Amino acid sequence: GDLNRLGIDVACDAPGVGANYHDHHGAAVTWYLDGIQGLDGQDRGRNALRNLRDYVLHRRGLLASTHVDAGACVDTTGSGRPDVQYNFAAFAPAGPDMPRLDGNAMVMNTTIMQTRSRGRLGLRSGNPADGVTILANALDDPRDLATLRRGVRMACRFYDQSPLREVLGAPIWPPAGLDMSDGSETFEAEIRARAESKGHPTGTCRMGRADDPGSVTDHAGRVHGVPGLRVCDASLMPSAVSANTNLP
């Protein structure tokens, strides 16, 4: 394993450490707003100062909100169990790979609730300051890709319903005219390019029975074979819950 490769003394042989990495992955279905003002620009200039003042002095305003105005957990297969989570917000996501838009927009974050793909977390070097390597393997399992396809298609149907459609302009993503059928390679490429972590990495010290070579802890987070050591975060979940991982 990583310890032997890096010349680190092994106190306990636990091959499950770092395995079973998974996350909630999704994509941001985004459209321009038309004729109404969203939240874009509220974090800059005078708007930012006004919002800060309202919160500091009165505990009200935008900073007193999560900015996620609505959400839904939806069964896209008819199985009786929700498999896609939606979160709605009146602004467009931005980041290193997604520059700010010129206009107002709204986003429907579309997230897989039961991730099947599994990756691995590893050591970069023997120096703990160097951080770790992460092989996410996002959408590696075809069931995850199929779920996100269904979720994105349903999100677009939501956008096309009245009265929401009356305040929307052009689609940003998925782009207008995209073939979103199951067999569309273009749709698959778009989803793979846009898929992102929703911030719920889980599972790399999963709990289980002591005779299970892939388990790391027991049900109370006690590490097998290392007295006095516990794991107390979401890494001990064998599978991520079908919700934000801070919920339990």
Which role fits each region the language model picked out?
Residues G1-L52, L62:
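Glycine-rich loop(s) and the adjacent beta-strand/alpha-helix scaffold that form part
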Residues L33-G38, N51-P248:
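FAD-dependent oxidoreductase catalytic-site/capping-region signature
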